[in-house]
């Protein structure tokens, strides 16, 4: 939940106006809006490049994934894996824009371990995939922007671990 939503809900629960401290936290959040939007735009505009690089890194590190018997063996399985890369990158942009991990949790992480386990997808492999996605994405960002985006990737990695 964004800072703005949190402040409004808290104040409303207590039937009061937001305090000056709460208003300052909203102001600080708003001041980071340009940066958060820039990061999300960069990730969205470079999705194809990021996904291609992450895929390349993952296959180089784990060729067993695309070898016969691997979970990404064959064109269909590989396409599904690449699709998931794009989906997770989109989740990251939602978190960055909101300045909060809640969209990632609500939209993407509830039940993800169970889903992958039921499909026979090794969760440790997904963790490696997200780590590759993180590296490919952060390599396109400035150090400051990478520091802002990194925790959202880490949140997904930790949730899957």
Swiss-Prot record:
Superkingdom of origin organism: Bacteria
InterPro entries per record: Globin-like_sf, Phycobilisome_asu/bsu, Phycobilisome_asu/bsu_sf
Alphabetical keyword list: Antenna complex, Bile pigment, Chromophore, Electron transport, Membrane, Methylation, Photosynthesis, Phycobilisome, Thylakoid, Transport
Membrane protein topology class: Peripheral membrane protein
Localization, UniProt: Cellular thylakoid membrane
UniProt modification remark: Contains one covalently linked bilin chromophore.
Alphabetized Pfam families for the sequence: Phycobilisome (PF00502)
Gene Ontology annotations for the cellular component aspect, listed alphabetically: phycobilisome; plasma membrane-derived thylakoid membrane
GO biological process entries: photosynthesis
Binding site for (2R,3E)-phycocyanobilin: 81
Modified residues (N4-methylasparagine): 71
Keyword Electron transport appears in the UniProt entry: yes
Family, as annotated: Belongs to the phycobiliprotein family.
Purpose of the protein: Allophycocyanin is a photosynthetic bile pigment-protein complex with maximum absorption at approximately 650 nanometers.
Protein name, UniProt field: Allophycocyanin alpha-B chain
């Amino acid at each position: 939940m964004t800072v703005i939503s949190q402040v409004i809900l808290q104040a409303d629960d207590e039937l009061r106006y937001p305090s000056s401290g709460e208003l300052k936290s909203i102001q600080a959040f708003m001041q980071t809006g340009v940066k958060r939007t820039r990061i999300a735009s960069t990730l969205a505009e470079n999705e194809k490049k990021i996904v291609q690089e992450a895929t390349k890194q993952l296959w180089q590190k784990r060729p067993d994934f695309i070898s016969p018997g691997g979970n990404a063996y064959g064109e269909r399985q590989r396409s599904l894996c690449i699709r998931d890369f794009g989906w997770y990158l989109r989740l990251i942009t939602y978190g960055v824009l909101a300045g909060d991990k809640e969209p990632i949790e609500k939209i993407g992480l509830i039940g993800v371990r169970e889903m992958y386990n039921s499909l026979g997808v090794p969760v440790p492999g997904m963790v490696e995939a997200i780590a590759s996605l993180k590296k490919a994405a952060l390599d396109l960002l400035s150090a400051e922007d990478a520091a802002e985006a990194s925790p959202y990737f880490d949140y997904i990695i930790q949730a899957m671990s």
